[in-house]
C-alpha cells in the first residue's frame, strides 16, 4: 500500500507526501460526505471531503497553487478489517484515472452527471426502510419506497410496516400482556382477595383486538409517508442494475415497470425459516408470521426452537392456558448470558411449559384435524399446532442480487454490508435485519437508516454505533440485557480481568402470595413454591475501576428497567456509581444499587427476605 497518492506534475513536493495511514484516517473521519462520492467496486463506497485533506498540510498556499493538478490513485485501500464484520474491504477504484465524485473540484475532468427518476429508491417498508426514506425526503431527496409482502407458507399476508408492527414486536407484546394478565388472575388473584367463578380466555377476541391495532398502525405509516413526501408503491421489486429497479405492481407478474435511482437501499428484513429436511414441516407447521392472526385457537402446541421468538411464543401461549411443549436442539437463547437464559427457562418450566431437550421433530403427518409429530428419540405425539421458530433468513429471494454479484452470506441469505451500511455495489446499501451481523432489532434498523440518509443527503459524517444496544425478551419472566454477557466478557478480556456482581431474589408481589409451581414441575408433594424469580447482574472490567460492560436483569418489566441502564452503560458507568445511587424502594430495579456479592467470591448471592431488590433481611 505504498504510494497511496500520486500527484500530476508535482509528485515529489514534500507537502504532498501523505503516508497511507494518515490518509486513511482522513478518509475514515469524513466518510460518507454527500458532496464527494467516490464510485467504487470495492466493499464499500469511500466518501471524503477535500476540506480536511486541504487542511492537513501546513503550507496551504503551495497546496492551492497546484490544487487543480491533483490526480488521486488509490490502490489496495482499506484492507483493514471492519470492526463490525468478519470480512475485509478492498480497493476503492479509479474512473478514467480519477476518483469520481458528484462535485469533484479535485480533478480537471468532472464525472458525467446522470439524471435519475429518484434520488433514493428504498426496497422494503419496515422500520429501517421507512425511517431512511422519510429522513432522506426531509433533506430534499426525491424518494420512492417499495413494499410488498410475500405470503407465508400458510398464506398469511399483512400491511406496510414490516415484521415489527405486523408479525413481531407489536403483536408479540400485546399477546404477552394478555398472557401476563391471565397468569396474574390464575396464580395470584385469589390471595389478593379477588373472586371469580369461571376464568376463560377467548382467542378470537384477542386476535381481533391485536389485528385491529395493527391495521391502525398500518394506516398511520401510510399517512406518515404521504406527509413526508415519500412516494409509496405496493410492488414486488428487484434490481436490474446498480441504479435500476424493476417492479410488479401488487405482485402482478404480467406487467413489469422500471425506475432509476441515484442510490438504492435494500431493507427487506428477514422471514422465519422452516427446515426442508423435516417431512411435512413446510406444509403443516406455522411460524411467527402466522400465529398472531391465527383464526382458530392454537390448542395443544409444539414450538420448535430455542430462540427468543420460540420462548416468547411458547410463553404467552402457556400463559393463555394452552398446553405447550418446546423442542430444543441444545441450549436456549444462544448468544445471551447463559445464567439468565437458564433462569428464564426454569421459570417457564415451573409455570408448566414442557421442554424436550436435545429432541427434534423428524416427520409431521396430518391426522384428521391434528398433526402427528414423530421425534428423533423415536417417540410420537399429537398436536393441534406446530410452530417453528428456529431462526430467520434474509428476505432476498427475487431481488436478483446474483446478477449484480452482490456479496451475500448464502447460509442465512443476508447481505454483507459494512458498518456504514455499504455493500460491494457503490450505489446500493443495506440496513436492518437483512444486513449481515446486525442485531435484528427495529430500533437498530431505524437508527441505521436515518444515519445513512443523513450521510447521503445532509453532508453528515455520522457513523452507526453498534455498541451497548439494549434488548428485552418478553418471556413470562422477562429478560433485559445491554452489553456483554458473562461468557463474552471472559472471552474478550480474560476471566481474571472481569468481575461479576449479582443477586438473586424474589419479586415482592410474588413473594407475598407464595406462588406455586405447576404440578408438572413439582418433584414431590412438598416441592410447591417457585424458585426465586429475579436476577440482577453487572459484568465489570477490573482494570477500568470496575466499569460496567454488561447489564442483565431477569424480572418483571425488564424492558422498562433496561432502557435507562443502557444510557448509563453508554456513558461508561462504573460499579461505584451504582453503589452511590439511592434506589427506589420497594422495586426490583433497586437491586442494582445493592450488589456486593461477586461470582469469584464463592459466596451465596441469593438474597434473604421478600421485599424485591431492596435490603430487607
Curated annotation (Swiss-Prot):
Disulfide bonds: 164-169, 611-616
PROSITE patterns per UniProt: PYRIDINE_REDOX_1
Keywords: Cytoplasm, Disulfide bond, FAD, Flavoprotein, Mitochondrion, NADP, Oxidoreductase, Redox-active center, Transit peptide
Region (Loop important for the interaction with TRX1), start-end ranges: 514-528
Gene Ontology cellular component annotations, sorted alphabetically: cytoplasm; mitochondrion
InterPro entries on file: FAD/NAD-bd_sf, FAD/NAD-binding_dom, FAD/NAD-linked_Rdtase_dimer_sf, GSHR/TRXR-like, Pyr_nucl-diS_OxRdtase_dimer, Pyr_OxRdtase_I_AS, Thioredoxin/glutathione_Rdtase
Binding site for FAD: 127-128, 147-150, 163-164, 168-172, 237, 433, 440-442, 585
Protein function: Catalyzes the transfer of electrons from NADPH to thioredoxins TRX1, TRX2 and TRX3, which in turn act as reductants of disulfide containing proteins. Able to reduce nitroglutathione (GSNO), a compound involved in the transport of nitric oxide (NO); however, TRX1 is more efficient in reducing GSNO. Has no catalytic activity towards oxidized glutathione (GSSG).
Family recorded in the similarity comment: Belongs to the class-I pyridine nucleotide-disulfide oxidoreductase family.
Other comment: In Plasmodium, the C-terminal redox center, which acts as the active site, is formed by two cysteines while in mammalian TRXR this redox center is composed of a cysteine-selenocysteine active site.
Name under which the protein is recorded: Thioredoxin reductase
Native source species: Plasmodium falciparum (isolate 3D7)
